C-alpha cells in the first residue's frame, strides 16, 4: 500500500516547450526511424522509409559534400506490385530501414532493411554510404513489421573462428509466431564455418512471446533484454516479467542434444520495484542503454506498469557484475506438473547451464538435457532504488551522458513528446538522483521513433517529420544561480547575473559559478544571489519568478493553490487581488532544495484609489510630475545645444 501512496504523491511535473535547434527533413522519403551516431567523427546516421542519411551531428542541416551523404533504397515497380498484391498493408512494401550498426571498426555500416517485405542486408561505407558488397536477402536479422519489438547486435570479435556475425532477438514466420534468439551461419571468405544457432521456438519455457528491447556484446557473452509472459494468474491474466538472457559467443550448439540450439542460454528476472511490505513492480521493460564507467558496466533501463488506468514508469540501473554473478551462481528453476521450484545446488551438474565452453560439442548429452529444462534462475537481479517513478507516463526511450561525477539521464515519452533530464550519482555506497528539468519537445506533434546522443552537446530524435536536434541544456533560460549551477552543463556569471553554457574556459574562471557536486546547488550561490523584494499594494496582482517542477512555500509552510494563488506551467507564482496576509517570504523548492526566494511587502496605507475624487487627485499629482519632467528635459536640451555650439567654435582637429 505504501508503494501506491508514494506514486500518488509524486511531485507534479510542469512542462516547458522547446523547439529543435535544427530539423532535417527530405520530402522525397517517408518516416524517419533508426539513429546511429559516431561520437568521435560527429557523424549521425538516420534510417528512414526510402533512404539512409549521413548527417553532421553539430548541424544536421549542413548538407555540404564533406559531411552529408544519402543512400537511396530502391524497390522496382514490379517488386512493389507483387508485394502489394499479397501484403496486408501496402506500407509494409515500402523500402525502409529496420536496423543500423557499426562494423569493421566503424568504417562500415551494417544495414538491415525491409524491401518489398524482404529483409535485405547491406554493408555500406561509413562516409560515402556506397555498397561495399552486394546486397543480399537474409531472414532472421530484422523484422518486416516495424511494430514488432526486435533487437540485434553486430559482434565482430569473440565468435568461433573470429568470424563476424549478428545476434538477433526476433520474430519469424508468416505471422511472426516464432520467437527466437538467433545467430545466422558463420561464414568467412565465402565459406560456411558453422551452422546457424537459435533458441527452441516451439517451447515457451525458452521464450514466451518476448518483446525485445536491447542486445549487447559484453566480453565472452551477448546479453538480451526483453519482457515476456511469466505465467497466467488465477484470473486468467497474463503476468509479464522483465528478463535478461545470456548466451556465449563460442557456442555452436550440442552434438546430439540441442543440435543447432544454444547450450549456454540462461535467463533471470529484472527487478525494478518500489520497496514496501507489498512491493510495487515495474514489470514492463521498455528500453535500455549501456554505460561503461570506472571499470564497470551498467545498464540503465526504463520500465512501466501494465497498461491500466494507473500506468506508471520508473528507471532502474543494473550492474553487469550483479547480472553475471546471479547467472553464474543462482539456483535454477525446474518446471513440473505441480508448478515451478528451485533445484538444490547439488543437483546442478558439473557443467552448469550458462557456462561457456571452448567446444560446446564436447558437452555431455546428460548435461545438455539438464540445461534444456533449467533455463531460469530462481532469484531476480535488483535494479536498486527506482529513479523518478512517475504516474501517467511511459518512458519509452533513454539516453545517458557520462560526466566526471555523475551520469545525466534523458528519459522520453515518445507518444507525448516529453523529456526528463535527471542527474544520477553515487555518494558513498548509495546511488542518488535529482530531477533537473522536464520539457515537451516540438516534433511537429509526431511520435518519437528513436533517440541518440552527442555527449555534452545535443540529443536527437526521429519522427515522421524528420530528424530533430536539441541542445542538452538551455542555460540562458535559467533565471537563478541555484537553477543554473544544478544543471551540469551550465555555469552562472556572478557579474552579469546570467546563466551560460559551461565551457573549459569559464568552468574554473573567477566570477563563474558551477556546482562541482553532482545534482547539487553550488554553495557559492548563496553569496551572490539576491533576495527578490516585491513592493505591492492592496488590490494589486503580480507574479514571482519560479522554476518548472517546483512547489511553493510561504514563511516555511506549503502554499495551497486557490483562486488568488495560481502556479503557472513555468513554475511562476501569480497572486491576484493582494491582501495584507500576502506579505511574507516565498520560496520555490524542488526535491527539498530552495531554487528561488522572494520577500513580498504589502503597503497598506497606499491603496489604489477607489473613488472619482481620489482618481482626480492622483491625476493632478501625475500632471505635476509630468510638468516637472518636461521642464527638466527642456533645460537638458538647451544645455546640450550650447555644448555642441562650443565644440563647433573651438579649435579644429588639424590645429590640435
Curated annotation (Swiss-Prot):
Pfam family, one: Sema
This protein's record includes keyword Disulfide bond: yes
Entries under SMART domains matching the protein: Sema
Domain Ig-like: 518-604
InterPro entries referenced in this protein's UniProt entry, alphabetically: Ig-like_dom, Ig-like_dom_sf, Ig-like_fold, Ig_I-set, Semap_dom, Semap_dom_sf, Semaphorin, WD40/YVTN_repeat-like_dom_sf
Glycosyltransferase found in the keyword field: no
Region forming the signal peptide: 1-20
Domain of life (superkingdom): Eukaryota
Subunit structure: Interacts with plx-2.
Family: Belongs to the semaphorin family.
Protein name, entry field: Semaphorin-2A
Amino acid at each position: 500500500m505504501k508503494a501506491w501512496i508514494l506514486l500518488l504523491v509524486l511531485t507534479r511535473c510542469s512542462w516547458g516547450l522547446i523547439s529543435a535547434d535544427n530539423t532535417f527533413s527530405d520530402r522525397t522519403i517517408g518516416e524517419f526511424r533508426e539513429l546511429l551516431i559516431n561520437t568521435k567523427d560527429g557523424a549521425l546516421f538516420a534510417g528512414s522509409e526510402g533512404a539512409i542519411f549521413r548527417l553532421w551531428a553539430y548541424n544536421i542541416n549542413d548538407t555540404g559534400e564533406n559531411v552529408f551523404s544519402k543512400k537511396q533504397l530502391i524497390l522496382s515497380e514490379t517488386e512493389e506490385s507483387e508485394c502489394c498484391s499479397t501484403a496486408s498493408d501496402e506500407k509494409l512494401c515500402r523500402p525502409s530501414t529496420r536496423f543500423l550498426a557499426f562494423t569493421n571498426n566503424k568504417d562500415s555500416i551494417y544495414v538491415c532493411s525491409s524491401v518489398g517485405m524482404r529483409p535485405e542486408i547491406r554493408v555500406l561505407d561509413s562516409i560515402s554510404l556506397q555498397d561495399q558488397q552486394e546486397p543480399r536477402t537474409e531472414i532472421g536479422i530484422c523484422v518486416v513489421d516495424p511494430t514488432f519489438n526486435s533487437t540485434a547486435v553486430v559482434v565482430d570479435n569473440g565468435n568461433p573462428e573470429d568470424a563476424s556475425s549478428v545476434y538477433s532477438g526476433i520474430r519469424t514466420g508468416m505471422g511472426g509466431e516464432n520467437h527466437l534468439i538467433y545467430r545466422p551461419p558463420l561464414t568467412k571468405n565465402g565459406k560456411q564455418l558453422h551452422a546457424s544457432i537459435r533458441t527452441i521456438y516451439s517451447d515457451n519455457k525458452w521464450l514466451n512471446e518476448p518483446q525485445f528491447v536491447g542486445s549487447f556484446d559484453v566480453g565472452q557473452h551477448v546479453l538480451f533484454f526483453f519482457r515476456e509472459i511469466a505465467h497466467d494468474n488465477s484470473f486468467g491474466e497474463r503476468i509479464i516479467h522483465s528478463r535478461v538472457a545470456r548466451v556465449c559467443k563460442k557456442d555452436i550448439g550440442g552434438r546430439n542434444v540441442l543440435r543447432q540450439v544454444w547450450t549456454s542460454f540462461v535467463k533471470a528476472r529484472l527487478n525494478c520495484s518500489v520497496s514496501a511490505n507489498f512491493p510495487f513492480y515495474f514489470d514492463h521493460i521498455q528500453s535500455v542503454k549501456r554505460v561503461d564507467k570506472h571499470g564497470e558496466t551498467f545498464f540503465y533501463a526504463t520500465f512501466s506498469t501494465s497498461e491500466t488506468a494507473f500506468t506508471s514508469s520508473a528507471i532502474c540501473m543494473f550492474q553487469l557484475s550483479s547480472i553475471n554473478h546471479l547467472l553464474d551462481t543462482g539456483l535454477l528453476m525446474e518446471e513440473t506438473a505441480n508448478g515451478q521450484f528451485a533445484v538444490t545446488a547439488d543437483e546442478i551438474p558439473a557443467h552448469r547451464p550458462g557456462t561457456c565452453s571452448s567446444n560446446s560439442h564436447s558437452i555431455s548429452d546428460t548435461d545438455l538435457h539438464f540445461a534444456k529444462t533449467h533455463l531460469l534462475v530462481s532469484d531476480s537481479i535488483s535494479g536498486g532504488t527506482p529513479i523518478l517513478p512517475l504516474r501517467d507516463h511511459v518512458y519509452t526511450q533513454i539516453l545517458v551522458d557520462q560526466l566526471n561525477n555523475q551520469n545525466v539521464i534523458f528519459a522520453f515519452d515518445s507518444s507525448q513528446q516529453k523529456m526528463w533530464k535527471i542527474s544520477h550519482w553515487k555518494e558513498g555506497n548509495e546511488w542518488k538522483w535529482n530531477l533537473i528539468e522536464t520539457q515537451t519537445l516540438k516534433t511537429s506533434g509526431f511520435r518519437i521513433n528513436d533517440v541518440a546522443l552527442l555527449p555534452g552537446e545535443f540529443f536527437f530524435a526521429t519522427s515522421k517529420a524528420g530528424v530533430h536536434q536539441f541542445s542538452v541544456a538551455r542555460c540562458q533560460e535559467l533565471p537563478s544561480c541555484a537553477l543554473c549551477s544544478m544543471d551540469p552543463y551550465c555555469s552562472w556569471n556572478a557579474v552579469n547575473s546570467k546563466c551560460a553554457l559551461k565551457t573549459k574556459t569559464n568552468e574554473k574562471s573567477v566570477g563563474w559559478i558551477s556546482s562541482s557536486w553532482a545534482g547539487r546547488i553550488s554553495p557559492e550561490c548563496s553569496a551572490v544571489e539576491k533576495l527578490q523584494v516585491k513592493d505591492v499594494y492592496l488590490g494589486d496582482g503580480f507574479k514571482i519568478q519560479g522554476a518548472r517542477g517546483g512547489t511553493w512555500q510561504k514563511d516555511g509552510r506549503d502554499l495551497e493553490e486557490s483562486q488568488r494563488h495560481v502556479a503557472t506551467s513555468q513554475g511562476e507564482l501569480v497572486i491576484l487581488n493582494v491582501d495584507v496576509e500576502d506579505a511574507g517570504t516565498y520560496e520555490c523548492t524542488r526535491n527539498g532544495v530552495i531554487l528561488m526566494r522572494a520577500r513580498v511587502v504589502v503597503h497598506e496605507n497606499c491603496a489604489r484609489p477607489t473613488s472619482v475624487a481620489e482618481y482626480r487627485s492622483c491625476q493632478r499629482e501625475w500632471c505635476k510630475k509630468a510638468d516637472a519632467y518636461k521642464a527638466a528635459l527642456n533645460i537638458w536640451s538647451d544645455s546640450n545645444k550650447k555644448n555642441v555650439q562650443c565644440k563647433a567654435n573651438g579649435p579644429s582637429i588639424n590645429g590640435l
